[in-house]
Amino acid sequence: MTEYTPMIKQYLEIKDKYQDAFLFFRLGDFYEMFFEDALNASQILEITLTGREGGTKEKIPMCGVPYHSASGYIDTLIEKGYKVAICEQVEDPKTTKGMVKREVVQLISPGTVMDERGLKAKENNYIASLYCYEGKEYGFAYSDLSTGELKSTVIEASEDRLINELTTLSTRELIVSSSEKEVLSDVMKEQLGLTFSVHEEDTIPAENEKLVTRHMSLSEKRAIGKLLHYLKETQKRDLGHLQQAVHYETSNYMKMDYYSKRNLELAESIRGKGRQGTLLWLLDNTQTAMGGRMLKQWIDRPLIDRKKIIERQNDVSELMAHFFERLELVENLKNVYDLERLAGRVAYGNVNARDLIQLRNSLYQIPRIRATLLSMSSESLTELAEQLDPCEELTEKLEEAIMDSAPISIREGGIIKDGYNSQLDTYRDASRNGKTWIAELERKERELTGIKTLKVGFNRVFGYYIEVTRANTHLLPEGRYERKQTLTNAERYITPELKEKEKLILDAEEKSMELEYQLFSEVREMVKDYIERLQKLAKSVSEIDCLQSFADISEKNHFIRPTLSEDGSLHVKQGRHPVVEKVMGAQSYVANDCDLDENREILLITGPNMSGKSTYMRQVALTAICAQVGCFVPAEEAILPIFDQIFTRIGAADDLIAGQSTFMVEMLEARNAIVHATKDSLILFDEIGRGTATYDGMALAQAIIEYIHENVHAKTLFSTHYHELTDLEKELRGLQNIHVSAVEENGKVVFLHKIKEGPADKSYGIHVAELAELPKSLIERASRILEQLENDDKKIIIASVKQPEEVHEEVQLSMFPLEPEKKASSKETKLLKEIASMNIMQMTPMDAMNKLYELQSKIH
């Protein structure tokens, strides 16, 4: 058996309790890692891997980071989904015999980050927990530890529903029991990209019972208990800022699955995975970090409560009508700090003096914001104004205690104002008077010795000293100066008087700093009493910020207030895609109408690729979402229903992680919509059926349309390249053909991006191929094939190919063979056959480009 050194034994004992985390083991001024941790961390953090004697024949792998710069390395590990256990020395090495005691003081994981540098200002950092009740339902709870938010619900025991909740929240970490982790599929774990943490205890900690209400179900309470236990055990400190758990029902909000949100680019761009080009990016003119976070929550969960939607619309109208007051409101909001996260840091005990200055300055703005809102006539804005608590006593205390120029460090003084504490004033006077005495001493010593360059200085090692250059040391009187330090060109001395004064000054400064830290800690503790009030204030300010953002964006982008229909009808005049319009510019964007009602439930959209079908479909959905979050909408006029759900299938999205083809994903998403949609839902299907053979796809597309028409009655936009489906208008009363128009000018296609009634009269696939610069002979051949198809009832035509010798000459496969003198080469014939068999209308632009590249490579 290996006999390790006592220190390595201690390390291994602690590491055994934190197998799933990197253990940052404090040794002097460094956090060290050993064994497997060292091997992995050295690669991830790109730091030097060394070795240490530990009682074995070979050195133990080791790497480390300085404790004062460890936060950057910790952030890197957390960002990559790892956990870090911080192990500190909990005894003073100077007073301890033998091995210093060490303990893990905090486990930092992706869902428990509290350091500002590891958090994004306008994004929540959610950690969630799960409790499976008899395989029937999930108790689900989540919290943002940095803000104290705590919410819970019960959802169906379905992976799809769980994924929807987790992705809606952009959850960073999920706490499950070992048995629950086994049940969750590996595909789900990989797809979500979140950290899984196993924790078994799920009873509510005694000190947190007040956070749970009686009416909550058992599964909900167990999920909350699991979350609270995990936080308690990993954070090892007071979590007094956690708010009472709020129960929510997913049925109280518009539902959208993960794919729908991604396709519509609500909060994350498909291309760059950032906010740029999303609806959130467009609507976000919030001035505070907490307002930005609330806005994302609103967009993730649009309202279905008519009263609440109208209330927000009224507020936006009122703010738009008071331009100058809104400008004043914006200026005040700019000076409001992140009160939610400040409250969290106060509870954690890691708030500094600068934070308290920001808090005080934020509280200064509250009476001004309140007065501005009260000058308006909106009832709900007045109600919001009256909820604004300026915390006057706290403001006065902070004004009285904290210096405006206070440093970030809380242990070096310079924080507490003069006059706040008489004992502190006494120490400061002693220190200041002493320094005045030092300055006077320097003047007197120069006069006494005649050395004009003599100076009195100070450093932390030697304290106060008198410095004289080597050239002038002979001028010093003998017996009075005691040499303290020799430099290259000077000598440093002390005198009995200087030594005595030094003690008085340093004692006063040390006592002053100790007392300042004590006084600051008392102020910080006092702020804890206001955490709940500050959190309520933060919510009200965030809501005001979101509403002013809606007003500002609506005004700048010429949005109008929509009317909510009672009969489920949708009528949008000159509607626009808000994000595309912003990117292109209002002058370039082509607006379009959209009308849906009980007699016109399905719009079948035809038209060429690149013509704007997908953009049109998305703009209808985004208009509905804008309305249901309470914002105005991009149109000249809009009457909109309240949709309970939106389902989308737009774009080719092979699920590579899950190993599912485009067609399988199409069918799964189609099933999801068909099974769960109601008459109050909106369905957007873009080219359903293109992922399989032509007739299969056409048959499925027709069957899906008929099923929605006969059984679901949801408002539906269905785009297709199957022109044959346009005949359904004659059979299905609630289906209407529309198309995206295009014209030919000088043999070229011009896409007008304008929606018109009726089916498209022809396709423009060959023109698109021409734009892609396929060989001219190939384009001509495709045109002849198309002409023959159109004249011969659309039978599939295959170009003639060279027949095997045993096939008789009279067997003719082509209906229009090449002339003998122009017979194509074997290579050309194969290419022509391949092109003839392609169905360009079923291809996405990316598929087409890939195929063109493949064909060109064969030609060359």
From Swiss-Prot:
One of its GO terms (biological process) is mismatch repair. ATP binds at G607, P608, N609, M610, S611, G612, K613, S614. Pfam families: MutS_I (PF01624), MutS_II (PF05188), MutS_III (PF05192), MutS_IV (PF05190), MutS_V (PF00488). PROSITE patterns: DNA_MISMATCH_REPAIR_2 (PS00486). It comes from the Bacteria. GO terms for cellular component: cytosol. GO terms for molecular function: ATP binding; ATP-dependent DNA damage sensor activity; damaged DNA binding; mismatched DNA binding. InterPro entries: DNA_mismatch_repair_MutS, DNA_mismatch_repair_MutS-lik_N, DNA_mismatch_repair_MutS/MSH, DNA_mismatch_repair_MutS_C, DNA_mismatch_repair_MutS_clamp, DNA_mismatch_repair_MutS_core, DNA_mismatch_repair_MutS_N, DNA_mismatch_repair_MutS_sf. Keywords: ATP-binding, DNA damage, DNA repair, DNA-binding, Nucleotide-binding. SMART domains: MUTSac, MUTSd. This protein is involved in the repair of mismatches in DNA. It is possible that it carries out the mismatch recognition step. This protein has a weak ATPase activity. Belongs to the DNA mismatch repair MutS family. This is DNA mismatch repair protein MutS.
